[in-house]
UniProtKB/Swiss-Prot annotation:
GO biological process: phosphate ion transmembrane transport
Membrane-protein topology: Peripheral membrane protein
Name of this chain's protein: Phosphate import ATP-binding protein PstB 1
Catalyzed reactions: phosphate(out) + ATP + H2O = ADP + 2 phosphate(in) + H(+)
InterPro entries: AAA+_ATPase, ABC_transporter-like_ATP-bd, ABC_transporter-like_CS, P-loop_NTPase, PstB-like
Subcellular localization, as worded in the UniProt entry: Cell inner membrane
EC assignment: 7.3.2.1
UniProt subunit comment: The complex is composed of two ATP-binding proteins (PstB), two transmembrane proteins (PstC and PstA) and a solute-binding protein (PstS).
RNA-binding is among the record's keywords: no
Binding site for ATP: 36-43
Occurrences of domain ABC transporter (ranges): 4-244
Length: 249
């Protein structure tokens, strides 16, 4: 079953067309990797999935992005969409507050005040982000005291505290060391049991390790998408073969 169906999607930044007639299904509860060289459109597409591109002046979008059969560019509440489709950015962006308050922030913003409810969600979310055992004795400590990898997992915990259906990840490990990267990748493998994950990555090795599906973009076009194993071992398009072989990038 598909979580997203993208049909005939075009996106323009002013006169520059950044996405060209994209047609892509994104299956539920799997990891889909978006790959391609810098400027190919993969991050632009990712931002289409929760309408982050709306924040950029001069953007024009045509086509359909259906989430569970509903057009997200139709008559919907964008704030609700961004709860349902959470996002983890390239650089960890914990809020300037305690570990506990970071995770509880979204719930409090929605008016949740019951401490038992907040405590339960904070613990569940930190466990879900594989961070609880590392921070359970210092929840009141400032989030900036965590390592880079811990901060990124805290941001994941903050995202899943809002109970999204989808988690978008824009190069979430590019600023992390190999050990922290491995922990986040292990976490993605666990999270996909409950969430649909779409990740942008420049690392071919990472895409191959963690994703079920891979989509290759080049100059705003979707060249090919298939099972990850096929994309890396037997792609249909010579351009895909050249990219995964490292012939260009």
């Amino acid at each position: 079953m598909n979580k997203f169906n993208i049909e005939n999607l075009d996106l323009f930044y002013g006169q520059n067309q950044a996405l060209k007639n994209i047609n892509l299904p994104i299956p539920a509860k799997q990891v889909t990797a978006l790959i391609g060289p810098s400027g190919c459109g993969k991050s632009t597409l990712l931002r289409c999935l929760n309408r982050m591109n709306d924040l950029i002046e001069g953007v024009k979008i045509t086509g359909l992005v259906n989430l569970d059969g509903n057009d997200i560019y139709g008559n919907i509440d964008v704030a609700d969409l961004r709860i349902k489709v959470g996002m983890v950015f390239q650089k960890a962006n914990p809020f300037p507050m305690s570990i506990y308050e970071n995770v509880a922030y979204g719930l409090k913003a929605q008016g949740v005040k019951d401490k038992k409810v907040l405590d339960a969600v904070v613990e569940k979310s930190l466990r879900g982000a594989a961070l609880w055992d590392e921070v359970k004795d210092r929840l009141k400590s400032h989030a900036f005291g965590l390592s880079g990898g811990q901060q990124q997992r805290l941001c994941i915990a903050r995202t899943i505290a809002m109970e999204p259906d989808v988690i978008l990840m824009d190069e979430p490990t590019s600023a992390l060391d190999p050990i922290a990267t491995h922990k986040v990748e292990e976490l993605m493998e666990t999270l996909k049991k409950d969430y649909t994950i779409v990740i942008v990555t420049h690392s071919m090795q990472q895409a191959r390790r963690i994703s079920d599906k891979t989509a290759f973009f080049l100059m705003g076009e979707l060249v090919e998408h298939d099972d990850t194993q096929i994309i890396f071992s037997n792609p249909k398009d010579d351009r895909t073969q050249g990219y995964v072989n490292g012939d260009f990038g």
